[in-house]
Amino acid sequence: MQEIATIAYLKIHTGKEDEFRAVARECRDAVRAKDKGTLQYDWFFDPDGTTCVVHERYADSDAMIEHMGNLGETLGRLLGMADLSLELYGAPSEEIMRAVEGMDVKVYGHFLGLRD
């Protein structure tokens, strides 16, 4: 299976910045405790703290599905405080594509890399 990478852009709703950061920590803690195939999960904020960018990498599509299931309600709370746009890199499974259906998602297929 092929690695899957994502870059999530989250525009945090006004007044929700502190709550967003608290729920982000819950997400990180759940990933540490539960995810088996998550290879990268790094959070970044712009200088004013209103936009968050999350870099994620998964061993394969199954690992990304596992991740989404492990976060469940916590991810739902986070997405209730921010507007999401997602870039998805690799060859995501049909299950992933169904899971992100209706979201603002752009998919990019792999072309070249150092390991090719």
Regions found by a protein language model. Give the residues of each.
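Hydrophobic residues embedded in beta-strands of well-ordered beta-sheets
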Residues: 50-52
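A short acidic, often aromatic-flanked loop/helix-cap motif at beta-alpha or helix-coil junctions
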Residues: 94-96, 111-116
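An amphipathic, aromatic/His-enriched active-site/gating alpha helix that lines ligand/cofactor pockets
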Residues: 30-39, 57-106
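Short, surface-exposed ligand-recognition loops at beta-strand->loop->(often short) alpha-helix junctions
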Residues: 11-22
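Short beta-strand micro-motifs enriched in acidic
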Residues: 44-48
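Hydrophobic alpha-helical membrane-association signature
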Residues: 23-24, 67
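Active-site-flanking beta-strand signature of metal-NTP-handling nucleotidyl enzymes
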Residues: 5-11
